[in-house]
Amino acid sequence: MKKLTSMLLALALVLSLAACGGAASSSVASSAASSEAVPEAASEAASSEEAKELSTTDALRIAGLKGPTTMGLVNLLSMEKDGTASLDYDLQLYGAADEIVPKLIKGELDMAAIPANLAATLYQKTNGGIQVMAVNTLGVLYVVEKGNTVHSFADLRGRTILSTGKGTTPEYVLRYLLKKNGLDPDKDVKIEYYSEASEVTAQMAAARKDAIAVLPQPYVTAAQMKDSGLRVVLDLTKEWNRVCDTQLITGVTVVRTEYAKQNPDVIAAFLTDYQKSVKAANEDIDGTAALCEEVGVVAKAAIAKKALPKCNIVYRNGQEMKKDISAYLQVLYDASPAAVGGKLPDDNFYYTEPSVLRKVMAAIRNSAK
C-alpha cells in the first residue's frame, strides 16, 4: 500500500504539470497516445478500493446539455451504481449552454460538456480558467424540411431557416457552409434562432409545409418519429467534409483549470471512467438508450435507441484531441474570429498528459499485481 501510495503521489505530480499545459507539457506530450492516453492502469490506481487515496472524495459535478454531447456521459451513472466507477458523479442537465457557463465560471461545476467553440471563447474570457480534456461528439447537424423543395444549398436562397445554437456550433457551421456554397447568410437567407432544439422541433411540428430547420441528432430522429413528412435534405457533416479537410467537432468536455491543478488524480480517474462510458454508449445501445430516458437526456428510450448510432459519440484526448480541435478552431477563426473568442487559444487550453505519464501508469500497474 505504501508503495502504491507513493506512486499515486508521483502520478499526481506528473498530472499537475500536465494540467498547466504550456511549454513543459507541449515538449513532452508530442508522443503521447491519444485515445489510449489514460490506460487501464489508471482505473486500477483510482478504483473505489483506493478511493481514500484520491485528493478529494467529493462527487464530481459535471454538466451537460440535453442531446448528443451528454449521451456519452450517462453510463457513468450505471458504473457508479454497480460499483465499477472510480468516482461518485453528480451529472446535471441543462437545455442551453448559457445556463452552464455562469455555474462553471463561479466554480459551482467542476466539468462540463459544451460546444467546442464555446470552450475556446470561455478560455479567453476567463483568462485560462478552463481547459479542454476530450472531444466528445463529432458532426450531428442536419438540414431538415417539411416538404420536398430543398435538394442543395442553392435551394435555401430566399428561405427562412429555423435553428438552435446561436453563438455556438450550429450557427457557425451553418454560416460557414452557406458562404462556401455561394450564399450570404445575412442577405440570402433568414435564420431564426431558438434557445433549445426542442423549441425548433415544436415549431416544425406546427409549421406549414416547406418549413426548414437545422437540427442535431437525436432531435432529427425525434421529429421524424412524430412527422413522417419531415425529411433530411442535407447532412452538414458530409457537406463540411466536402469543402474542408478538418474534423467537424460538435462538443468537448472541459474542466476548470483550478480543479485540474488541485485534483490531477481525479482527472485521471475520470478520463478512464469516461472512456468506458463512451465505449458503452456505442456498444450497449439498449442500455444507454434506457439511461438517456431515465436521466432526461432524451425524452424516450426508443428515440435514443434509433438515434445513438447517428450521434458520432467519441472519446478523443491527448494529442489527437489537440490536433482535431486546433484545426477546427482555425477554420472558425478564419471565417469569424468572434466564433472562438477573438483569438485562437494557446497550448495551455489543452489538457494533455506528458508521455512520462505512461511510465508512471506502468509502474502503478506492476505494483498492483
Segments (PLM) and residue ranges:
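Secondary-structure end/capping motifs
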Residues: 260-339
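A bilobed periplasmic-binding-protein/Venus flytrap-type ligand-binding module shared by bacterial periplasmic
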Residues: 75-77, 141-152, 247-265, 314-317
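Conserved C-terminal helix/tail region of periplasmic/extracytoplasmic solute-binding proteins
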Residues: 326, 330-369
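Short, glycine-/small- and polar/acidic-enriched structural segments
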Residues: 38, 44, 49-193, 214-217, ...
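Pocket-lining segment of extracytoplasmic ligand-binding domains
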Residues: 117-118, 126, 199-293
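Bacterial lipoprotein signal-peptidase II cleavage site
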Residues: 19-32
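Bacterial Sec-type N-terminal signal peptides, specifically the leucine/valine-rich hydrophobic h-region
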Residues: 14-17
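Positively charged n-region of N-terminal signal peptides that target proteins for export
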Residues: 1-11
